[in-house]
């Protein structure tokens, strides 16, 4: 299709036609979102809204893939080297805003506070390295892939084979995380099982990339970026307005950070919180004690669980209690190796949950100067590693083969940084807004009055969100919340 291929057009005409297409697309997307919002207000079930979003996006990406089909090698592998810098920057931003950024960035900042800024600094710093040292030279050599570049630059097949191996290894590890994110989002929005969500995502990827290669992927990613940034910004703006009446979360969250800091000091001294953390500490100590003699501990656990089950049956206890006791017996480790692994995991988990929460705004936390110095060094080392890793990602570097010139390669990196900045500048605000919500609206709530979304997330994946009344007081404490970063 000429609108995505630019056949018979000058570069200027091609960009003008793209501007019209994506302006029309943006208007259509806005109208679609407004329509679904109206239908929701009219009583349309949320599951149907999730299905509508999923179907619309899969059809959209598949349609772009079909319209971008090509048999030309240059079009298939490097989109004809005609992608304007701004659109390549948008596609690169979409390519980069993967599960780690879109799903996990705010969660990482929520869980680690100041320490999470290492990811933002490292990832954005990596693009500076790309702009200065990599993108222009990759485009100058004019190959199709990174292994092609290595083969042309260093000669022979040895460098090429090393590049192939590294690209496959890195891409495989990277794709696993993305597929997990696809399954997670699909399961949450539509109610489909996680496994079905993974296959739906894989089918969409196949349709949008198989026929058109890099050309199809490029224009699909441009369309994706608009959806991603809108989907990310809307809830953050809504939370900002809700808590501060300010629609600019990047400005407003400083005010809430002060409140979060004050609430943290209160929770660190709260007697109920200390009680719950003490229970976790006792559980960790018990697990550590079991690890000293695993066979004896396993035998004692089996005897206690079996005895409890027999007592419940003898007393004609409620069926639910008998089922729970039966499940507890069945869940016991089958052998000493499994028992050792279970006790080790229990010790690790309970030790972590017994620790006081990190202060969100505290840089380089540690119990003494030596620990804080180690934390500082780890922060800087992480920034450095992330910079180098970002600059070497194969799927990012390949994007700079698609621009018309070396100059536009540099410009597209600048545009990439801008489009990524929009999300990364918002992620710290989202982390603080969510933490303020958790501290003020969830902590202290009676267990029988908790919002329904907690149970729904527990069904999707208990490691993402689960609560339990550890001290049996009927009130939810912060230490009783198990929250995974991906849920934020």
What are these regions (language model features)?
Residues 2-87, 207:
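N-terminal alpha-helical transmembrane segments of multi-pass membrane transport
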Residues 3-15, 35-44, 64, 108-112, ...:
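Membrane-water interface regions at transmembrane-helix termini and the short interhelical loops
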Residues 12-29, 93-94, 114-212, 237, ...:
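Helix-loop-helix module between adjacent transmembrane segments
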Residues 21-26, 45-71, 144-171, 177-187, ...:
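Membrane-interface loop-to-helix entry segments
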Residues 32-33, 53-70, 95-103, 123-134, ...:
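Central hydrophobic cores of alpha-helical transmembrane segments in multi-pass inner-membrane proteins
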Residues 38, 64-69, 172-175, 179, ...:
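Hydrophobic alpha-helical segments and their helix-loop junctions in multi-pass secondary transporters
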Residues 41-53, 111-121, 186-196, 368-383:
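Interfacial loop-to-helix junctions that mark the boundaries of transmembrane helices
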């Amino acid at each position: 299709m000429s609108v995505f291929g630019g056949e018979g057009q000058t570069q200027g005409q091609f960009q003008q036609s793209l501007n019209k297409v994506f302006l029309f697309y943006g208007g259509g997307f806005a109208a679609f979102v407004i329509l679904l919002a109206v239908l929701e207000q009219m009583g349309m079930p949320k599951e149907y809204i999730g299905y509508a979003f999923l179907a619309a996006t899969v059809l959209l990406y598949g349609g772009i893939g079909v319209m971008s089909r090509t048999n030309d090698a240059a079009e298939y592998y490097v989109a004809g080297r005609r992608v304007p810098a701004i659109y390549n920057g948008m596609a690169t931003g979409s390519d980069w805003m993967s599960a780690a950024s879109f799903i996990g960035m705010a969660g990482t900042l929520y869980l680690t506070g100041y320490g999470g800024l290492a990811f933002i600094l490292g990832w954005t710093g990596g693009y500076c390295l790309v702009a200065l040292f990599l993108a222009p030279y990759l485009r100058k050599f004019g190959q199709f892939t990174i292994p092609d570049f290595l083969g042309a630059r260093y000669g022979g097949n040895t460098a090429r084979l090393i590049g192939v191996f590294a690209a496959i290894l890195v891409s495989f590890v990277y794709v696993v995380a993305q597929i997990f994110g696809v399954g997670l989002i699909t399961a949450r929005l539509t109610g489909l099982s996680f496994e079905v969500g993974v296959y739906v995502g894989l089918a969409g990827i196949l349709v949008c990339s198989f026929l058109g290669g890099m050309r199809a992927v490029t224009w699909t990613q441009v369309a994706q970026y608009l959806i991603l940034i809108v989907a990310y910004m809307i809830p953050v703006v809504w939370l900002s307005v809700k808590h501060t009446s300010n629609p600019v979360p990047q400005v407003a969250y400083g005010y809430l950070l002060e409140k979060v800091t004050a609430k943290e000091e209160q929770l660190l001294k709260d007697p109920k919180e200390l009680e719950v953390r003490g229970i976790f500490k006792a559980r960790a100590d018990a697990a550590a004690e079991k690890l000293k003699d695993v066979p004896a501990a396993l035998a004692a656990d089996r005897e206690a669980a079996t005895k409890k089950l027999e007592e419940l049956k003898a007393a004609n206890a409620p069926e639910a209690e008998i089922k729970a006791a039966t499940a507890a017996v069945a869940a016991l480790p089958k052998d000493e190796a499994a028992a050792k692994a279970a006790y080790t995991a229990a010790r690790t988990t309970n030790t972590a949950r017994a620790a006081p929460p990190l202060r969100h705004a505290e840089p380089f936390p540690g119990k003494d100067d030596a620990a804080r110095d180690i934390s500082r060094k780890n922060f800087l080392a992480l920034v450095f590693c992330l910079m180098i890793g970002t600059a070497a990602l194969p799927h990012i570097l390949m994007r700079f083969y698609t621009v018309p010139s070396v100059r536009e390669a540099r410009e597209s990196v600048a545009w990439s940084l801008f489009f990524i900045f929009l999300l990364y500048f918002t992620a710290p605000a989202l982390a603080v807004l969510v933490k303020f919500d958790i501290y003020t609206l969830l902590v202290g709530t009676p267990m029988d009055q908790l919002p329904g979304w907690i149970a729904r997330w527990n069904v999707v994946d208990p490691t993402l969100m689960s609560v339990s009344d550890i001290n049996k007081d009927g009130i939810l404490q912060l230490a009783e919340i198990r929250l995974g970063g991906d849920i934020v």
